[in-house]
Regions:
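Conserved, well-structured ligand/cofactor-binding cores
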Residues: 1-471
Length: 471
């Protein structure tokens, strides 16, 4: 055991631990989620500390041997070492100070070892004086959130692009499958299944653009702002250099905010990112709901789609298979929307020169980036790639619907078309059969008017027939 102290007193710390007294106090105080810090966030914060050490060495303020030891320790954390040394709860009071000091203590103790000294030799490498040099939790912590959000957005955007690509494949594959379009959950006019798939892809593409645009704001950082944004204890050269070094470490461009006070007390960039995720989730919910409805049945529903069977659906009804993959995407999106509300409240509740609610904001933002990625990948891998279409069912509903009478208006007139619709409703017969029985159009004419190409593009279906008849 070793003894460490802060201004509240002295505590014993097990020799094998790389964290110290302030982390132990956080462990005593915060038992909230039962979870540990996000591993990507630990990596992001270590990147911030590495960049800071490099910048402080450039200005000459940080001893080179100490700085190099801190950089080496940070590199080890970035590589995934010491993951078990970051045990603090992600939801905590103190605006992230417990997380910041957890990192400072781990880096300091590892740097002590690198320099040939035992852990706790804070006269050699100090968590505060060296690892936190020219920093405050109030600039290091939000900067690490931004770095992590950027890192986590990449696999999410890749997942969304996979979804777009697969939907576009389906759009091409189903381009000739005509089905009944529906508005108000009622029969409307025909549409191709390919057009529906293309529309889903278009909505997701907007989500990708929206998220990318929001994440761009995370490249503006407040490193060098220190406590309240005035830059107290941070040299001007350091403020410039730390943004450059962070860009080099992360491989992404970072820029110092024009107004460090604003960048320290406002966290609206995270609301922007969260909003992009939420709106994308809304689009995904619509798509998943449509898939579930089109797959309803199999005997007593719409039944146009055949979703892959992934597991038995009921503990009491033999042979039942449920749309579990579409359902789980729905639930993922509900969670994302709920977490967005938490993020919104956290962003709103800053006071004066700082927003102390960043820990819960970060926790929910990271979860949303992860949940949405996993939900989308699950939907693509477990549902979309193996999706099948019941073409006969699509044709069945199309032929039975009176919605196709809309396309016949230019050929038969409103009164005749209305009478056909009324008879179809009352008798249950198909519009096509009634037209043929009454000799209003030939079968070839009907097939031409009701073909996918004629029915699903701007203009009058069967316009050539009208010209031939001189109408």
């Amino acid at each position: 055991m070793r003894k460490e102290h802060d201004f509240l007193g002295e505590l014993e710390v097990a020799d094998e631990l790389y964290y110290g007294v302030q982390t132990i106090r956080a462990l005593e105080n915060f038992h909230i989620t039962g979870k540990h810090l996000d591993q990507d966030f630990i990596k992001a914060l270590a990147m911030v500390k590495k960049a800071s050490a490099l910048a402080n060495m450039k200005t000459g303020r940080l001893n080179v041997s100490i700085g190099k030891a801190i950089v080496q320790a940070a590199d080890e954390v970035i590589a995934g070492e010491f993951a078990d040394q970051f045990p603090v709860d992600p939801i905590q009071g103190g605006a992230g100070t417990s997380v910041n000091m957890n990192m400072n203590e781990v880096l300091a103790n590892r740097a002590c070892e690198i320099l040939g000294h035992p852990k706790g030799s804070y006269d050699i490498v100090s968590p505060n004086n060296h690892c936190n040099m020219a920093q405050s939790t109030n600039d290091a912590f939000p900067t690490a959130i931004k770095v992590c959000a950027i890192l986590k957005s990449k696999p999410l955007l890749e997942a969304l692009q996979r979804l777009v690509d697969e939907l576009e494949k389906k759009a091409e594959e189903y381009s000739e499958i005509l089905k009944m379009g529906r508005t108000h959950l009622q029969d409307a006019v025909p549409i191709t299944l390919g057009q529906e798939m293309g529309a889903y892809a278009s909505g997701i593409r907007r989500g990708i653009k929206r998220i990318k645009s929001a994440v761009e704001g995370a490249h503006v950082i407040n490193m060098g702002a220190t406590a309240v944004g005035t830059g107290l204890n941070a040299e001007p050269n350091y403020i410039h250099d730390v943004a450059y070094e962070l860009s080099e470490v992360v491989g992404e461009p970072f820029y110092t905010a024009e107004n460090l006070i604003d960048a320290t007390n406002n966290t609206d960039v995270f609301a922007d990112i969260s909003s992009g995720l939420k709106v994308t989730a809304l689009v995904l919910i619509k798509m998943a709901n449509d898939f579930r409805l089109m797959a309803s049945g199999p005997r007593c529903g719409i039944g146009e789609l055949k979703l892959p069977a992934r597991q038995p659906g009921s503990s009491i009804m033999p042979g039942k298979v449920n749309p579990v993959i579409a359902e789980v995407l729905n639930q993922v999106c509900y969670q994302v929307i709920g977490n967005d509300t938490t993020i919104t409240l956290a962003v709103e509740n800053g006071q004066f020169e700082l927003n102390v609610m960043e820990p819960v904001l970060a926790y929910n933002l990271f979860n949303n980036l992860c949940y949405l990625k996993n939900g989308v990948n699950t939907f693509v891998d477990k549902l979309l790639v193996d999706l099948e279409v019941d073409r006969e069912q699509c044709e069945y509903w199309l032929n039975r619907s009176v919605g196709i009478v809309t396309a016949l208006l230019p050929h038969l007139g409103y009164e005749t078309a209305s009478a056909l619709a009324k008879e179809a409703y009352e008798t249950g017969r198909a519009i096509r059969d009634i037209i043929l029985d009454q000799g209003l159009l030939t079968e070839d004419e009907i097939n031409h008017i009701l073909s996918p190409k004629e029915m699903t593009r701007p203009g009058i279906a069967g316009a050539k027939l009208l010209k031939q008849k001189g109408n």
